[in-house]
């Protein structure tokens, strides 16, 4: 199975999470590709059976608005029928950005197949294990 992890990271925290998600996908027998928003056009995602999206909370608990949000908005309606999952880190607040993102996905018909993974600041071992489990669940 061909899978993708599409992520934006400003500090390296979400990038570390993305790598762990890809490890989980690979451990479950999938081919995993790591991509940044700049590397993704809407039609590109048709090549993947499962896609994990990662983005940290920015500002007032929103998705990164310059690169990630425009890419995701352009792609989300074409994700119907694909297995998808979300992950990301945040520095303050209570994770509202993830709940808003999940609701946006639900409204767009995105098939979120497992619970999203969030962590505060730098992911610890437990968060990285949760990311690996997310990658595995997305593939199975």
Please annotate each region the language model reported.
Residues 7-11:
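Aromatic-flanked redox-active Cys/Sec active sites in thiol-based oxidoreductases
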